[in-house]
């Protein structure tokens, strides 16, 4: 999977010379992510705010015929299902979204490439429910999950939190748990490092919480 997140546009509002940095009132970061999706099950994230929306049917207008998408519902502990058949999406919820911070299982019958295009979320808040949920970083970064930004993703880890990362190649999960102030598990004591475009399971044993991020642009 190749990732290219670029500053493509800067919206400038100024009175006077538009090139003066002191006169920038707002900046929009627009980027793109080239995502190679393998055959079979994988956990996928879209880390850009797409226009006109982040519906699965918009993001994947014409995937391989037979492609399936499963989105986990943390409230009901069940999956919402969509499938692309004969040029159309059908299933439980045609309004299913895959926005920054969310995640799904995708199961195409053959590998394909797609490009996500949209705005980078300069400020984000991802809800992490009690129990199992599928989440992702709202920013397209591959960094240690619980380390503080800018060196890490700033996940609000708590004692007992579990993280499961699915491998398309092996069909198994990598497991790590935060216990008594340290990570233990398959990562050998290091925090999980999700890839750009990767979603993962979190098992939060405590109350619901928010994973907040602020990304600063400029000098």
Residue ranges, per PLM feature:
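Sec-dependent, cleavable N-terminal signal peptides
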Residues: 1-23
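N-terminal exported-region signature
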Residues: 19-219
């Amino acid at each position: 999977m190749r990732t290219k997140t670029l500053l493509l546009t800067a919206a400038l509002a100024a009175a006077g010379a538009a090139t003066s940095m002191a006169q920038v009132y707002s900046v929009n970061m627009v980027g793109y992510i080239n995502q190679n999706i393998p055959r079979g099950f994988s956990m996928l994230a879209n880390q850009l705010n797409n226009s006109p929306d982040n519906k699965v049917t918009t993001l994947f207008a014409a995937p391989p015929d037979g492609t399936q998408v499963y989105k986990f519902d943390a409230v009901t502990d069940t999956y919402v299902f969509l499938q692309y058949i004969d040029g159309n999406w059908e299933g439980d919820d045609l309004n299913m979204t895959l926005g920054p911070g969310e995640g799904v299982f995708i199961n195409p019958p053959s590998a394909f490439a797609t490009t996500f295009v949209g705005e980078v979320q300069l400020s984000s808040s991802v809800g992490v429910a009690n129990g199992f949920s599928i989440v992702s970083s709202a920013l397209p970064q591959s960094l240690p999950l619980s380390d503080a930004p800018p060196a890490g993703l700033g996940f609000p880890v708590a004692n007992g939190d579990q993280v499961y990362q699915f491998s398309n190649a092996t069909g198994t999960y990598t497991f790590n748990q935060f216990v008594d102030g340290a990570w233990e598990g398959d990562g050998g004591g290091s925090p999980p490092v999700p890839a750009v475009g990767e979603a993962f399971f979190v098992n939060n044993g405590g109350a619901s919480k928010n994973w907040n991020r602020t990304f600063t642009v400029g000098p």
